[in-house]
Amino acid sequence: MSKVKIGIIGGSGFYKLDALKDPVEKSVTTPFGEPSDALVSGKIEGVDCVVLARHNRKHGIMPTNINYRANIWALKEEGCTHVIVSTACGSLQEAIAPGELVILDQFIDRTTKRAQTFYDGTCGQLPGICHLPVAEPFCSLTRDCLKKAAEASNIPVHPSGTCVTIEGPRFSSKAESFLFKSWGGHVINMTTVPEVI
């Protein structure tokens, strides 16, 4: 079995990870430009990890302007085998209270201004049409590990959920939130898509 290296993308308020031991900062560039911030490598409980602040550590990049492709490319180039992300979300369901963890398994994309693929013929990628399957956009094995870790830590957890990702930076109107809830949305945020793709 190959060695696991975890990429961690932190969202709003998640800029420093105290659990990361022996941190080493590295600035990188990618064929898609610079990622949101420097990569910070270290170990958590003996596991190699690379942490990246999605909005940068100064919280200076709006959701629409995040270079999602550069972020993912940079983590892949650093050898990350898995990526775990944290996002600030709002609940669309009464059963999901603030502070509870929702392990996403589906998304509804309501963004309009973001590059959705690496395969658009730019940056040395193959030109032409490339249809990507996203019926199950989140890794079931990683989701199961997160569920077990949350339960072991006594963190209230919802083992599945559908996230509605909106363009931002504005929040949804009440009418939009009721619509998203009627579609089966559990939580709402501004960054899951296209990051998961």
Where are these predicted regions, by residue range?
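Active-site rim beta-loop-alpha module in soluble metabolic enzymes
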Residues: 135-181
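Conserved active-site and cofactor/substrate-binding residues in soluble primary-metabolism enzymes
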Residues: 63-70, 78, 137, 141-145, ...
